[in-house]
Structure formats: C-alpha cells, structure tokens
Amino acid sequence: MIRFARATCVAAAMLVAPLANAADKDAGDVDTFARYAGTWKMQLNYVESAHSKARVESMTVANDCWRSDFFYVCNQIIDGKSRALIVFFYDPVAKRYGSYPIAVGADTVHPATVVVDEKSITFPYDMQDNGKTVHMRIVNTFTTPETLDFKQEYSEDGQKWVTMATGVEHRVSPKAK
C-alpha cells in the first residue's frame, strides 16, 4: 500500500482565526484517509525498468488509524511489524492534502503532497538518480470500499509515466489486527 509515501500545518498567529473558521467547514475533508483503516492483503507485481527489478511481493498491511481535527494518523504495520507512522492532513487555508510519513529508524521526516479525488489517492514524490530528478508516484484507486488497485510509476519529464509495479489490495478486516 503506502510504502513510499512522503506538508505542513504551521499557522502564524495571524492565521489562527481564519484557520479556526475554516475548521468548522473543512475539517471533515481529512476523513478521505479513513478508507485506509483496517487490515489489507496485498499482492504487487514489479516489472523490470530503469527503477525497479522484476519480482512479486505479497504482504499483510494493517493500518491502525485515528482522527484528530485536521489530522488522520495511521500506524502502518507490515507483516506484523510497525514500519511507519503516517500523519495525513488537510490544510483548509491552502486547500490541499499532505502527509508526514515517519519511517521506523528514519533520521528525517519529509513532508509530502497528496492528491485526492473521489476514487483515488496519489502520492507524488521526486528522487535523485545520478544528479537527475526522477518524478515518482504511487496511485491507489479504490474500486470498491474493500478493494484498491495499486500502481507505482516514474517519469523523467513529468509527462510520460512508466509503470514499475501494479497490484491489488483487499481489506480483510475493518480493524488492524
């Protein structure tokens, strides 16, 4: 699921009042991430590409999640081991979604933009490859409330996308086990 996932919710004193007013209207937008809660069985198929090796991966991903105001937080447990704490947020002033994925053992936390629509959640990010920026994205398309299609892609120009991996996830429990 969200394995590579990677802005900010810092308000200056002058923004506190507008933010509070926006909270009444827009705080519910963070609920879009509630669809990740629960335990999922995942099957991924990677292809040989410039940024991936051909392989098949299977895993169980349990997302133990909760909501607090503008934040939706998930402890992501992969095959029984806690691997990351992902803090999703909605900024009603900027009208944008983002996340702070905190991986176990990581020295830094990198804020990430998250693109949300009715059927999908996309996690775009960039990486460096020999001094060249490569655009990456993970796209989760919810085909039913209990199933999502996974796709990981890269692009050297931000226009033409090459698929690195595809897969499917099935929710097996509404709660993390």
Residue spans of the language-model regions?
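Hydrophobic small-molecule pocket/channel-lining residues, especially in calycin-type beta-barrels
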Residues: 22-177
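Repetitive helical segments and hydrophobic/amphipathic motifs
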Residues: 12-15
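N-terminal signal peptide c-region/cleavage motif recognized by signal peptidases
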Residues: 17-19
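Bacterial N-terminal signal peptides that target proteins for export
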Residues: 1-9
